[in-house]
Amino acid sequence: MACEPPTDPGGAAGPLPTSTLGCNILPQGNPPGWGQELHNGQVLTVLRIDNTCAPISFDLGAAEEQLQAWGIQVPAEQYRNLAESALLEPQVRRYIIYNSRPMRLAFAVVFYVLVWANIYSTSQMFALGNQWAGVLLATLAAFSLTLTLVLVFERQQRKANTNTDLRLVAANGALLRHRVLLGVTDTVEGCQSVIQLWFVYFDLENCVQFLSDHVQEMKRSQESLLRSRLSQLCVVMETGVSPVVEGPEDLEDAPLLPSTPGPQERPLTQTELYQLVPEAEPEEMARQLLAVFGGYYTRLLVTSRLPQSMGTRHMDSARIPCPCQLIEVHVLGTGCCPFLAR
């Protein structure tokens, strides 16, 4: 099975390799030609693994060799645990399967059938006209509601996903200085759920400088808006709590025999609200913003879902926004629509 090389969003055709899909396979490609210049938004390589295999792991060693062929020295040890712990936990893998396009399509079909049956049976119960009128009413209503549901699904896919995109914050933070961004997508091939980890080249220094200046300007003139937007960049995390075992005050009150062991209790946990972009110097906040939304930007880039722009700052294509434009407009902007899909 071949991995189709997608069109390079950055304007230059990056060699996307072919592979046989397995539980731990990296597509192998030919090294780029000598002197070939990398462009912002250029796909470097893609890791593809079968999500139905257990256990699975990314072949990041082979990815390291592929990046070295492009002249990028990134030791896999710097981000191996960050990427695998973020994406390969069982609950995350199940979420990717249930959130896949075929599952959404199946849900829409079931929703259509249930709505149609309920509306038709209701129309017959109250004898609203003849049989064909009931069929037409049920069909139009079910189609309209199902189309609305599909549009809601599609709109959610254009938002940053806290269960996939934002889990790559730590990995992208480690790769920013190497001019590499990670993003994750999923697809279904046959009966296999496939996780795709994308490596995209992007020199973010200009974006860091612009966002740093923009954050500094917002601190001076729009501090309330900045605080409001950053307050939405938080996730709920569970942390373990060590229970405090209190012994008897008097040793004479202690039982001579140990108590009967009961069923194993669940570990105690507490939920904490973690701020993804805490208050700091403008440059540090700019780098953190790029790390937080790097996975989101990469997913939109490789799936051609980035919003169209009339001009770009740091991309070769005039109609593709760069990361700082996306963050400026859709994260720090004055829009009322939420940008996170919980």
Curated annotation (Swiss-Prot):
GO terms for cellular component: plasma membrane. The chain crosses the membrane at residues 106-126, 133-153. Residues 245-267 are annotated as: Disordered. Keywords: Cell membrane, Membrane, Transmembrane, Transmembrane helix. Disruption phenotype: Homozygous knockout mice for Tmem268 show a significantly higher mortality than their littermates; at 24 h after cecal ligation and puncture (CLP), 43% of all mice die. At 231 h after CLP, only 14% of mice are alive. Mice show significantly higher bacterial burden in lung, liver, kidney, blood, and peritoneal cavity. Its main location: membrane. It is a multi-pass membrane protein. It is found in: Cell membrane. The keyword Secreted does not apply. Pfam families: DUF4481. It comes from the Eukaryota. Interacts with ITGAM; this interaction inhibits ITGAM degradation via the endosome-lysosome pathway. Interacts with ITGB4; this interaction prevents ITGB4 degradation. Stabilizes cell surface expression of ITGAM and participates in the adhesion and migration of phagocytes during bacterial clearance. This is Transmembrane protein 268. It comes from Mus musculus (Mouse).
